[in-house]
């Protein structure tokens, strides 16, 4: 079991939803938390909800200068958790270039910016903790998920490469792949969302992962098996199941 007392964690994308719920759990366990997101007003409200020592640094992960400035302001941390994300459901027939680019820039490139800003100091110290939020949608391409599924697949591959390179270095890398969570983002969906989780429940799954030495957790468990097993299906079977004509 990980010791949280005296630790300092930077949570990016923590002003609401999963990030806010996870910040509360980490903070309640004894770690100091620094919360980042774009909205200063939401960050102030989030910090007020923390049970322990907490602060906020506003940041836009789509802006490299903003990320560098925030990383300098945050300073040395024991761990960083990337939770920032944007989402629009979209079929390719309804292609919206601005939205597709935003999903890639925030969800994937934003993660690379944050990791790139914080990882060198961890490598120099020989210790640290990097937690990345993927998605069940990142295992294989899905209909109506243009931009989002691709961005999450990229994030998941990034986490796998980080894990491969940093094994034995003293830096722990972990990947959490949640399914549907009740947030402002999923309110946009006009389709059924099986096994829909509340942010607090998803945060508990993620926090449980962070207290272990495991690399990856995909949840809810039963629902996640559908996506994990889909990787072994031949294309004809996969698309007949997930994208019937």
Region locations from a protein language model:
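Active-site loop immediately N-terminal to the catalytic Tyr-X3-Lys motif
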Residues: 93, 142-146
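C-terminal helical subdomain
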Residues: 175, 191-225
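Substrate-binding pocket helix/loop in short-chain dehydrogenase/reductase
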Residues: 91-104
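Conserved glycine-rich cofactor-binding loop
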Residues: 15-16
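Residue(s) in the substrate-gating loop at a strand-loop-helix junction
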Residues: 135
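Conserved glycine-rich Rossmann-like NAD(P)H-binding loop of the short-chain dehydrogenase/reductase
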Residues: 29-46
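Active-site helix of classical SDR
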Residues: 115, 151
């Amino acid at each position: 079991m990980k010791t949280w007392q005296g630790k300092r964690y930077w949570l990016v994308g923590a002003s609401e939803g999963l990030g806010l719920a996870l910040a509360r759990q980490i903070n309640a366990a004894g770690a100091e938390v620094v919360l980042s997101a774009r909205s200063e007003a939401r960050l102030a409200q989030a910090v007020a909800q923390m049970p322990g020592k907490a602060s906020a640094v506003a940041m836009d992960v789509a802006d490299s200068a903003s990320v560098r400035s925030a990383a300098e302001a945050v300073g040395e941390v024991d761990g960083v958790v990337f939770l920032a994300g944007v989402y629009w459901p979209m079929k390719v027939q309804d292609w919206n270039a601005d939205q597709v680019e935003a999903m890639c820039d925030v969800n994937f490139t934003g993660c690379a910016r944050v990791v790139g800003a914080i990882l060198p100091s961890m490598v120099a110290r020989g210790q640290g903790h990097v937690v990345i939020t993927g998605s069940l949608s990142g295992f294989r391409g899905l209909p109506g998920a243009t931009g989002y599924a691709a961005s999450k697949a990229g994030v998941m591959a990034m986490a796998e490469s980080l894990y491969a390179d940093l094994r034995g270095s003293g830096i722990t890398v972990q990947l959490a792949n949640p399914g549907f969570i009740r947030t402002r983002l999923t309110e946009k969906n006009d389709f059924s969302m099986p096994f829909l989780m509340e942010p607090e429940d998803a945060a508990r799954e993620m926090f449980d992962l962070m207290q272990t030495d495991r690399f990856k957790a995909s949840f809810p468990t039963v629902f996640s098996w559908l996506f994990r097993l889909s990787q072994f299906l031949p294309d004809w079977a996969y698309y007949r199941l997930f994208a019937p004509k």
